[in-house]
Curated annotation (Swiss-Prot):
Protein name per its UniProtKB record: Uncharacterized protein MJ0832
GO cellular component labels: anaerobic ribonucleoside-triphosphate reductase complex
Domain called ATP-cone: residue spans: 14-101
GO BP, one annotated term: DNA replication
SMART domains per the UniProt record, alphabetical: HintC, HintN
Pfam families linked: ATP-cone, Intein_splicing, LAGLIDADG_3, NRDD
MF GO annotations: ATP binding; endonuclease activity; ribonucleoside-triphosphate reductase (thioredoxin) activity
Keywords, alphabetical: ATP-binding, Autocatalytic cleavage, Nucleotide-binding, Protein splicing, Repeat
Free-text description of this protein's post-translational modifications in UniProt: This protein undergoes a protein self splicing that involves a post-translational excision of the intervening region (intein) followed by peptide ligation.
Amino acid sequence: MISAKDFAEKVMEFYVIKRDKRKEKFNVNKLAKSLINSGVNYGDLDTIISEVCAKVYNGITTDELKDIVYNVLKKIDKDVAENYRNGIILKVRTSEKEFESFDKEKIAKALIRETGADEETARKIADEVERELKKLKVKYLTAPMIREIVNYKLIEYGFEELRHKHTRLGMPVYDITKLIKSGSRENANLMYNPESIHKWVADETMKQYALLAIFPKHIADAHIKGDIHLHDLEYAATRPVCLQHDLRPFFKYGLKVDGTGLHTSVSKPAKHPEVAIQHAAKVMMAAQTNMSGGQSIDEFNVWLAPYVRGLSYEKIKQLMQMFIYELNQMYVARGGQSLGRDELIFIKEGDKLKVCKIGEAIDEFMEKYKDKIIVDGDTEILYLDGIAEVYTISVNVKTGKAEFKRVYAISRHKPRGKVYKVIGKDGTSIIVTEDHSLFNYDENGNLVCVKPRQMKHIIRNFNNPYDVEYRIGDYIETNYQRTDSKYNSRQNDIPEKLKITKELCQFLGLFVAEGSYITNGISITTKDDDIAKFIERFVKEQINENIAVKRYEDSVRFVNKGFYRFLKEHINGKAINKNSPEFILKGDKEMKLAFLGGLISGDGYVSKDGRVQIYTTSEQLLGQLHLLLSDLGMIYSITKIKEEGEKIEIKRNEIVRNYKLYVIEIAKNCTEDLKPYVIPKYKKERIKPANYDQLPYDYRIIKEHLRKITDKKPYNDYAWKSNNRKLKLNTLEKIEQLNPHLREEINKFKLNIPFEIKEIKEIDYNGYVYDLSVEDNENFITATGILCHNTIFSSINLELEIPEFLKDKPAVIAGTTRGTYGDYEEEAKLILEALVDVMMEGDAMGKPFLFPNFIIKLRENAFKDENKELMYKIHQLSAKFGIPYFINMLPDWQVTNTNAMGCRTRLSGNWTGDAEIDTLRTGNMQWYSLNLPRIAYEANGDDTKLFEILHERLEILKEALLIKHEVTKERLYVDNLMPFLTQEFDGESYYRYENTTKTFGFVGLNEMLKYHLGEELHESKDAVKFGEKVIEYIREYADKLKEETGLRWTVTQTPAESSLPYDEKILIFENNEYKLVKIGEFVEKYLNRYKDRAITYGDNNIEVYIKDENIYAPSFDKDGKIVLKPITHAIRHRGKEIYEIELESGKKVRVTGDHSVFTINDNLDVVEVKASDLKVGDFIITPKIIPSISKDKIYLSEIVKNKDKYYVKIKDHIKFIEEHEEILKESYKEYKTKWKDLKPVLKKKNAFRLDLIEDLVDKEKIEKISYGHANYINNKIKLDEKFGYLIGAFLSEGHWNDKCVEISSTNKEFIENLVEIIEEILGKDAYYITVKGDKRRYKDLYVIGLNKTVAMIFESLGLNKLSSNKEIPSILLSNETFLKGLIKGYIDGDGSIYVDESKRDYSIRLYTTSETLRDTLCLALKILGINYRLSIDKKSKVNENWRDCYVIKITGKENIEKLLDVEIKNNGGKDVIPKIAEKFKEIINQYSQREWKERFGIDVNNLHIWEDLKKGYMSRYRAKKVLNIMKNVKEIEEKYGRLLDKIGQLIDNDLLFERIKSIRVLDEIPEYVYDISVEGTENFIGGEGFICLHNTAGRFARLDYKYYKEETISVVRGDLNDVDSLYYTNSSHVRVDAPITLGEKVRIEEKFHPLCNGGHIMHIWNIESAADPEVLMDITKKITKTHIGFWTYTKNLSVCNRCGISMGGLRDRCINCGSEDVAKFSRITGYLQNISNWNRAKQKELEDRKLPRI
C-alpha cells in the first residue's frame, strides 16, 4: 500500500470512534485500500489522502470521516464517490454463489499454473487487468468475466500461446442463459425445442475442448476451415468409434455388465437360449456408452448355434423375435419407449422403499449427476453403475413373482410420436408413448410385450417382494433410552423394545388414517367412542400406564416423548405423505390385517351392503397398500380418483384441490378376513361374507391354454364350460386343486391378473417422458401393480455356412464346450432363416425393424442348391424392405474373415494373419476425412501440386489420429473409463485396442476429378484412372505408416453429409411470450450478433443459423393445425419489387413477387403460390386460431425486480426477520437508524424494501406491494377474466402519469363493475373515485384513480401512457380466459355492439388510434379463435391533429357467442372454404336427383350446392352439414370416403380462406428484403391482421462455397440458391444421378473397393421398380464375380402410421387407407432412417438419386 509520509506523523496518534463506541487508531493504509476498492486511480491517491488527513482530528467518528472522504472524492469523480459511500468494492462472485473481494494475486497464480507464464509476465498482466476492472461500473465481477479480460490483455501484449491455454470452455453466458431459461420457464405444450439442452451444451463444450486441449492449433484450424474433417469431435477426448463383438467369452465366463461386477450383479454363463439371447443384447447395451459409433456381433448365428440344438423352428424364430425386439426396444428406450412424468413407481435405496413419480425421481437423479449424463440423439441416459444402488419392483415373467431388481440406467426425452392413456375398468390407468410396451397374455399363457394400441387387457401384478421378517409376538427396537434427569417424567417412558401386537398394528393403521403429531405427542381425529376407548386401552396397557389420555370433542390426544419419537421414525406426518411402517410391509399376515383394520377404522368406508373402501391422498401409501393387499391375496380396484386442481366446496367456500384423492375398493370376497381387526362396531357389523368379487378382470385369453395343460377339468364350473362367461380366480383355484402339478403355472396367473380395458385414448402431453432399465427381468410395476416393459446402433454379421477358420474351434455353451462349431451348421442356418422371417414380418404393425443391420457374408457355397431357398428369402427381404447388406468374400484380395458395420467400416484378417485376432473384439478407433475437391481448387490443374497438397493434408490427419490413439489409450488403461472393454478373459483384455484401425477417409473424389480434369468418374476412363492414382497414393501412405508406427492404418470411403420488406411484422414466440417484431429488425439483430457464423451466397444473399436461440414461429403443419416450430435461420436478400396484397377482410401483407403465400388447389391440397401469380378474387390462407399460453398468474414483485423504491409485506414476516437477521442488518446499513431500533419497526409495520430482500424471499411469500409510500396492493395477480377486464378497460379509456392511473367514463355501470373488480384484485386501498362534469356530452364523467403503485407497475408491464402507443404487453398475451376478459373490458370502454335485427346483423367494433394496439388486439382475438375484419376511419377533415382510427369488426354467430356469452341468430359471418362445392357437385352428379331422393332420402336441392358454385365458396357451417349428410349414407361413404375425409380435414383445421380484394406493386424497391426459415413446416405468420406466409429455403460443400465460391459453383451438387442443400458425392462413388447402367457403375466403383481396406460400400438406390427377388438374386450373383466388396439394395419406403402398411417409394398418402400420416424412410450413409431427420444436403441428394439401368 502507498504511505502518506507527509501526514503520517500528524495522524499516527489520532483515534477514530466507531459506531459501537470502540476506539481504533486511524490507519492511512486502510483508508488507501478502501479508496482503491472504490475505483480511485493510483495517480489520484496521494492527493486525496493528503486532503482527507488535513481534515482529520482526534476523536473523529467513522460517519464524520466517511463524510469527509465522500466530499473530497465528489470533487474528483462522482461515480467513485458514490461507490465509496455505498460501500461498493470490487467483488467476485464465485461458482459456489458466494462473494469474495477481488485479489489480483489469484490472476497471477492462475496464469503461472495454467499457462506456464513466468512470474514477471503474470504479475504484469494481473496489474493491467486490475486497472481495467476499476473502470467497470458493475455490482460484482464473475470469474468468466475476469478470464475474458485476462485473455484480452494476453492478446494485447502478444502472448497468443498463453491465451490459447487460458481460454475458457463452454458457450457464451448469454447463450447458456437463454437455453436454461427456455428449459425452465417455457410451457412444454408450446413445443419446447426438441433438442436436449444438456446434449447441446455438452457437445459444444466437448468439441471446444477437443479443438483447444486435445488437438494443436494447426489441426484445429484445418478442421474449422474445412481442409479436413475431424469426425465425432464431441467424443475425441473420451471414446473410440466402433467394435466387432465376440460372444464366446460371455458364454464361457458369464456377463459383468459394468465390466467389474462391483456395481452390477454378475450373471453366470447362459445355460438357456433365452438367457443367451438376453446376454447378447446386453453386451451391445453395455458397450454402447463406450463407443461413439456402432457395434456389431460378428458370426452371430454361429455363436448361438449350440444353444438352439434340438429346438423346433418355431421356437428358434420366437427366440430371434425376442432378440430383435430386445435390440429395438433398447435402442428405442434411448429415444422412444417411455412413461408419462406422473406415473407412480417403486424406488428402493438402502432399506427404504419409496413410491414416487417417475419423472420427479429421474429428474432428481439427472440434476444430481448431470455431469455423467450421456446423450443419444435427443434422449438423455444416466447409467447408475458406481453412482447409486437403486432397486425397483420387477416381475419374473416365468414365475410371475415380484422381485427387487436393480435399476442400471434411467432415461428421459421429449415424445416424438403419439402419447396414449390406457384406462382400465378397474380404475387404474397409465400414460405411455406409442412405442412403449406393456404386458399381455398370449394364447399360450406367456407374458409378452405389446404396444398400447394392441393391448387387450392390463396386467396388474399382485405380489409382495418382501420376505416375512416380523411376526406378532416379536419385538421391535424403539431406540428409547431413559435418563435419570429430574425433568424426565414417568409418563415419557416407553419400553426399549416394543412388543408387536395386534393392537399396535391396529393403532399404527389408525394413526396413518387419522393421526397427526402435536408437541411431543399424538392426536387421533375421531368422534367414535369405540375408537377412543381402544386408544386409551392400547396406550395404558402397551405403552405406559402413566400416560394421560385426553378426549376432546373430535379427537383423542396424549403426550409421550418416547412413543412420539418412535412413531416419527416410522410414519410421516402430513396426510399427503403418510406411509405404512416398513416393518409392517415385512410383517406376517396378521400384522398386515391388523394394520389394514386400523386404517379402515379411521379412513375407511364400509357401505351397508358390505363394500369396503380406503381413502388416501398419499401416493406413498397407495403403493404400500398395493403390496399389503397383494400379500393378503386381496385384489382391488380404484373406484374414483379426485384430480388435483378439481374444485371442491368447504363450508360454502369453493377451493381448488391441490392433491389427488384415491379411493381403493377391496374385492368383496376378500373383506371378511378384515372383520376382526376393524374397531368401530358399526363398520365391523357391515362387513359380510361374499363368494364373488365385483372386479372387471377376465382370464378367457388363456382358457384354451388351460384346457391343453390340465389333466383334470373343473367340469362343474360354469365359467369353464361357457365361452361367454368371464373366467375368474375361483376357476383357477379349482384347476389348481385338481392338478397340483400345475401349482406354479396357475400361481403365475393368479399373481398377474388381466384387467379389462375401458379406453385407450391419444392425449396431449407436455414435457419429458421417462423410463427405467432394470436388470434381468427388463420390467417394473407401477404403484398400482401395472406391469411395464423397460426399454443401440447395431449390426450382426451372419454366415450361410460355418467358415473354415471356425469349423474346428470348440463350441462354447453354458460355461463349457460341446463339440466344434462345424457340428452346428444346420442350427446356424435355422437361426439365419428365422432372423430373415422375423425381419420380413416387421413389428406388430408390419413396420420394418431399423436395427440391427443385417449383414450376410457370401462365400463360395452361397449359390449352391442347398442354399437356394434361403438365398431367395434373403432377397425377398431386400425387395420388401431393403434391409440386408452383402459382403463379397470371393475376390482374391478378401482373406479368411472380413466383417463390416452398416456404416461401411470394415475389418479384415490380414493384420496379423489370425482371423480371430484381426476381426473380433476390436474395431475402428477413428476415421478423419480429407476434402478432396478443395485440394483440386488449390492445385489449380497442376498434378504435382495436387499430390503435394494431398501429402500435407495426410500428414495433418496422421498427427490427429495419433493424438486420438494416445488419448483413447489413456482413457482405457490409465483413467479406466471403460471397464467393460478392459475386463480380462484368459489374461487378455476383451477389447483388443492395439488391433484397432486408424483410418483415412475422403469426400468428393468425383468433384475433385471434375474440377481437375474437367470430367467426372462416369464420363471417362482417364478420370477413373486418375481417381485410382489418388486413392492409391492415400493407401500407400497408410501402408507405409504401418511399418513406421506398428499401428494398423487403413483407408475408407467417407459419407458426405423469397422475402418481406424490413418493416413488415411477423409473429414470433420467445421466452414463453408472443411478440410482434419487424422482420428486418429481427434478422439484422442476429446477422450482427453472429457475423462469424453468417454465410453469404448468390447475389449478396446472407443467412445465419439461429436455432440455438430457442425462438419459435406459429406455423401450420401438414394437418392444418397451428403449432409452434423453431426458427432455424434469419435471412437477408437483395431488395426486389414489393407486392401489397389486401384481403376483403382488410388484412394486408407486403412480400416480394417470388415470395409465396398459401391457397388450396383443385385436389383440395394446401399449396404455395407466388405473390406474382396471384390475382384479385383468389383465396389465400390465414390462421383461424393461434395456440394460447398456459400462464395463469403473475407476481408484481417479479415484474419490478431490481427496481428501487418498492416496498412489500411478507407472510410470516417476524419469522423471516429472525431467519435472515444478519443479512438484513447488513442490507439496511445505509439507513441512519440503528438496526436495534429499525428491527422493531420492521416487525410492526411489515414493510421491507424489495430490492434489499428480493433474493431472500420467495415470490409466493410476498403478499402486498407498494411504490414509495403509496397504498399497498396485492402481489399475486391471477390472469383471469376480471384482471383481463381491468386491463381492457385501461387500454380503452385509461391513461397514467407518474402519480396515478386514471380510467374515465360516463358509463356509471361500467365504472361500478370496474370498482368491484379493482377491490377484488388490487384491494380496497388501491383506488379512489371522482366525478367531473363532461360539458361536451352533458353527462357526469366518472374517474377512477389508481394509486402510484399501480402506475409504476403499469409502466413496468409495458402499458404505454399515450393512446397512440398503447399495446397489449407480450407478458399479458396469455391464456384465453384473461384475453376474453380483456376484450370485454375494451368493448365496454372503447367498443360498440351494433345490432340491426332487420338485416340480422350483429357485430362488435373495437376502435383505436394505436397501430400496435390494433395488432395486439388482433393477436388476442386469434388466440381466442375469433375472426375479424379490419378497416380505417380516416382522420377528421375538421381537425387535422386527429389521428386515423383503426377499426376491428367482429362478426359471425360463433365468434360473438364465444366472446359475449350470448345466444344469437346466425348472422352470416364469413368463414368459407373454396373449391369444396365443386367436389360435392362431382359426388352429386353420380346419381340423378330422383335416385338421391328415392335411394338415399336426400333432396339435393336443399343442400344449396348450386348457389355455392356461383359464389365460388361454401360456408364452413354448411359444408359441415353437407359432409355429415353424405357420410351417413353408407354407399357414398364407401365410394367417396377418402374425398370426404379430405373435406373433413379442411373443415376441422386451424385455417381460414380469405379472398383477395386488391394487389398492387409498390413504387419503391427496398435495399434489402428479409426472410426466416422455420423447421419442419417452412411457413410463418405475418402482415396486418395475420396471414400465413411460406419461407424460402455437406459441411465441406458449404465451407468451400464460402471460401472457394467460384471453384465450388463449377462442381458442387445441390441448389445454389439453397446453401444448406449443397453436397459433394460420397467418397469414390459415382454421382447418384449419373446416366449409366448398373454394370457401368459396378465396373467404376469396383476399382476402389480393394484400395479402401478400412471400409467401402456400393449403394444400389431406388430399387422399388426392380424389387423382384429373382432379379436381385441374379444381380447379387453377378456382383460376387466382381471386386465389389460390400453393397446393399436401398429401397425407399413409406410406412403408414395409421394402418401400418409399408409401401415402396416416398409417398405423401397411404395407398391403403388414404391417411397422410406417413413416415418416409431411406438409407443415409449406412442406416435406414426417417428422412424427416436429414439435413437439407442429404435430402437434396435423396431427390437426385436414380436407379441405374439394369
